[in-house]
A protein has these predicted regions:
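A detector for small-residue-rich transmembrane helices and their helix-helix packing motifs
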Residues: 1-156
Length: 156
């Protein structure tokens, strides 16, 4: 049930990012933000902390959506007063879905925060979607990275 929730939420949030940036770039950014968040979590927890990272990736995607929306609203002028609402919405979803008895709360929080930072930076820099070859390359690298990690996990 937990995994199914992650898959559904990731599809929703990556789909939202994909509408703005393209699906390959969205998958690559989500993975990069999740990796950074998991590295931060590992640095805080130290050795011996195990984490699969699917939830972290879900919260990274939520953070990217929140960061992109913040920049979008800020640029619209009249909505500047409400520009921070997407960040608040992301934090509210984190409070509802990211904490729990056996949840890796720190990984979820770092996923949201790193994702929001990525979303803001990309939102400020990207003026249009990347070309198709970039989308395919980013998506393929993300998929190969995940497959490689699972291969390593199962062969150790």
């Amino acid at each position: 049930l937990h995994l199914a929730g992650n898959v559904i939420a990731s599809l929703i949030f990556v789909g939202a990012v994909g509408r703005w940036l393209g699906s390959g770039v969205a998958a690559g950014l989500m993975l990069a933000a999740a990796v950074a968040a998991n590295l931060l979590t590992a640095a805080v927890h130290g050795p011996g902390h195990d984490s699969v990272g699917a939830s972290t990736a879900t919260f990274a995607a939520l953070g990217i959506v929140s960061g992109l929306q913040l920049v979008r609203r800020w640029r619209l002028g009249p909505l500047r007063r409400r520009a921070w609402l997407p960040i608040g919405a992301g934090l509210a979803l984190f409070a509802m879905l990211g904490v729990g008895e056996r949840a890796d709360v720190l990984a979820h929080l770092f996923g949201l925060l790193v994702g929001a930072l990525v979303g803001v930076v990309v939102g400020l820099r990207a003026r249009r979607r990347a070309p198709a070859w970039v989308q395919v390359t980013a998506g393929a690298l993300a998929a190969l990275s995940v497959a490689g990690c699972w291969l390593l996990a199962f062969t150790r």
